[in-house]
Amino acid sequence: MASAEPLTALSRWYLYAIHGYFCEVMFTAAWEFVVNLNWKFPGVTSVWALFIYGTSILIVERMYLRLRGRCPLLLRCLIYTLWTYLWEFTTGFILRQFNACPWDYSQFDFDFMGLITLEYAVPWFCGALIMEQFIIRNTLRLRFDKDAEPGEPSGALALANGHVKTD
């Protein structure tokens, strides 16, 4: 049987970066529709989002692996949300020094320096829940088989409902 290895940290970072980038575009499109009823759904983000999300989710993955047996899900999501605020503030502050910060929350009632806003606490918390339960857990299950041939699976390794057949 082929030896399947877990994805490398760089491979997982890449998946997390692309996922975060996509979610950012979808969120801004939905926000534009809700606030302005814009049926064009123009979703936008910055290339910086790739680094920001990829790195942040990889760090949350490490938190998940350390906390999963030690504290309940809702507490973990609260910790991830606090991390998200710290990371968003830090990366925004650094990018602002180069006039490169792509977001500005100054128009929100509960913003801090225009870099973070409490109005996003519930979306960040829900995002943390989805991130742990679906994105991180499933990404950690992915395997890379360096000996696999390109093409459709066949024989003993044929897939059935997303699971490798072993019989």
Swiss-Prot record:
The chain crosses the membrane at residues 15-35, 41-61, 74-94, 110-130. It comes from the Eukaryota. It is a multi-pass membrane protein. Pfam families: ABC_trans_CmpB. InterPro entries: CmpB_TMEM229 (IPR010540). Residues 36-40, 95-109 are extracellular. One of its GO terms (cellular component) is membrane. GO terms for biological process: macrophage activation; response to bacterium. Its main location: membrane. It is found in: Membrane. Keywords: Membrane, Transmembrane, Transmembrane helix. Residues 1-14, 62-73, 131-167 are cytoplasmic. Belongs to the TMEM229 family. This is Transmembrane protein 229B.
